[in-house]
């Protein structure tokens, strides 16, 4: 479809909902905002223009039609969680600038990369180590992990789009991508989608998920998947090359190019560790996670690892600020106007007789496998989280469990297609894995991942007293 067609369909969806009859329980301004919000989501999916532009269209339409005031429209930009992810994106630029991410990866490869399976685990450890401070898994996967995987593959004469792709490149690309979608489960600050979920949850239910609560829910399924998935993929989609003795020499060559560890790397590493400590101890220090992230950014600037020009040029952070602020603001207003509650009550009345826990399993599976219809995890969260979460809460599910459950379910669907998340096209686009194989292997991975995340996450929440 061309731009005009996609834009026309977006507007059409909004107009249809606008003029549909609705229950008197929903005020006219609430229904009109629902129409505009839905059209904005459709715009995110169809993308006649970039996501940020579609968000601005949503704000303008809502204010111009007197559905909300200008002050209400801009209220989402004052949300702390929105600024948390923006600050964390800026901080991740300091990690990339310093070269710390590359050094960690090549050090692990040099130490443990004697086989293709061990190489996969070394890459997994790299992603895990840097994920708490890189909330853009696209930047983490595409900017740090992918170039390393590509270099390793080519070093073993594994070329894309040819007979040598299966030597090692196909396996490493598949595994690195899978791990990138798993680390987002463990840390709240490892993915923008996580913070979108917690922001929407806070707006809808008035409950703020802490960094520590997220870690408690995600650590068990996340660690299990981190350990299992490289081996599982090794079994269902094995590389032709099993032993990689020359990987250590290649990694040493890259480390020689990087040279001795720099002051910038040392300072970023110290700041990184301190931020994690402050995030994980916020229950005692009472420091807001956003303040901690901003402290990290300022510390990087003071130590010279980051400049104001770097911050101004970090397009991902500013883009997230625009679209996420809009969504969080609109979603909160839909909750205040009673739209979400009416929808949740209607659906829950038709699910009489089903226990909320088993309903959560069914809705979780629906949420995960709806990813086939979305070109990003963010679009899926935006479209489905508020409604699905409200249904579960209306059926009796605890609010913290509900919010965290959808956080856990953000991961399994990201392996399903070659367009499931922002980072997916980078790994798929390398040309090592055919589309049909990507979908087939990705489905197998997602089934295992879904079961582990649901049951492991439930166990974690029970053990730590959340459930």
Residues covered by each model-derived region:
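Flexible hinge motifs at transmembrane-helix junctions and intramembrane kinks/re-entrant loops
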Residues: 23-31, 38-56, 73, 226-227, ...
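Hydrophobic alpha-helical transmembrane segments
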Residues: 7-8, 33-34, 38, 52-56, ...
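Generic alpha-helical transmembrane segments of integral inner-membrane proteins
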Residues: 8-16, 38-42, 60, 64, ...
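Transmembrane alpha-helix interface/packing and boundary motifs in multi-pass membrane proteins
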Residues: 41-50, 126-136, 177-188, 278-284, ...
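Interfacial loop-to-helix junctions that mark the boundaries of transmembrane helices
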Residues: 1-2, 24-32, 44, 71-80, ...
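Membrane-embedded alpha-helical segments and adjacent helix-loop junctions characteristic
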Residues: 22, 52-162, 314, 318-320, ...
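Structural signature of hydrophobic alpha-helical transmembrane segments
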Residues: 25-35, 79-90, 287-297, 347-359, ...
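Juxtamembrane and boundary regions of transmembrane helices in multi-pass small-molecule transporters
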Residues: 1-19, 100, 137-141, 156-259, ...
């Amino acid at each position: 479809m061309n731009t005009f067609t996609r834009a026309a369909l977006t507007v059409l969806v909004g107009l249809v909902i606008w003029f549909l009859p609705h229950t008197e329980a929903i005020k006219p301004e609430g229904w009109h905002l629902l129409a505009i919000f839905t059209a904005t989501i459709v715009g995110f999916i169809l993308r006649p223009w970039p996501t940020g532009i579609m968000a601005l269209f949503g704000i303008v339409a809502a204010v111009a039609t007197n559905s909300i005031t200008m002050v209400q429209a801009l209220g989402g930009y004052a949300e702390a969680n929105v600024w948390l992810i923006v600050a964390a994106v800026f901080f991740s630029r300091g990690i990339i600038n310093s070269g710390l991410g590359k050094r960690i990866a090549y050090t692990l490869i040099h130490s443990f990369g004697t086989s293709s399976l061990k190489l996969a685990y070394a890459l997994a450890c790299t992603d895990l180590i840097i994920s708490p401070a890189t909330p853009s898994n696209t930047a983490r996967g595409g900017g740090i992990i992918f170039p390393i995987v590509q270099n390793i593959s080519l070093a073993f004469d594994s070329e894309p789009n040819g007979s040598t792709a299966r030597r090692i490149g196909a396996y490493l690309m598949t595994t690195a991508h899978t791990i990138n979608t798993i680390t987002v489960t463990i840390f709240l600050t490892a993915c923008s989608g996580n913070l979108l979920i917690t922001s929407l949850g806070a707006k809808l239910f008035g409950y703020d998920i802490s960094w520590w609560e997220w870690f408690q829910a995600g650590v068990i399924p996340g660690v299990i998947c981190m350990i299992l998935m490289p081996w599982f993929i090794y079994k269902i989609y094995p590389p032709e090359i099993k032993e990689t003795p020359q990987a250590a020499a290649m990694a040493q060559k890259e480390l020689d190019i990087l040279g001795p560890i720099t002051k910038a790397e040392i300072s970023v590493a110290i700041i990184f560790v301190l931020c994690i400590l402050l995030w994980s101890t916020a229950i005692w220090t009472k420091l807001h996670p956003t303040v901690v992230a901003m402290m990290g950014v300022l510390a990087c600037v003071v130590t010279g690892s980051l400049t104001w020009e770097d911050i101004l040029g970090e397009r991902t952070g500013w883009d997230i600020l625009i679209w996420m602020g809009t969504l969080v603001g609109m979603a909160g207003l839909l909750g205040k106007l009673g739209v979400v509650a009416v929808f949740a009550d209607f659906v829950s009345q038709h699910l009489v007789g089903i226990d909320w826990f088993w309903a959560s399993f069914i809705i979780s599976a629906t949420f995960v496998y709806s990813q086939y219809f979305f070109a990003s995890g963010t679009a899926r969260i935006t479209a489905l989280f508020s409604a699905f979460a409200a249904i579960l809460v209306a059926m009796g599910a605890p609010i913290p469990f509900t919010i965290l459950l959808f956080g856990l379910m953000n991961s399994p669907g990201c392996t399903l297609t070659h367009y499931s998340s922002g980072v997916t096209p980078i790994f798929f686009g390398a040309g090592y894995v055919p589309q049909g194989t990507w979908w087939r292997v990705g489905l197998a991975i997602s089934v295992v991942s879904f079961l582990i995340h649901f049951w492991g996450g439930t166990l974690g929440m029970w053990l730590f007293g959340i459930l």
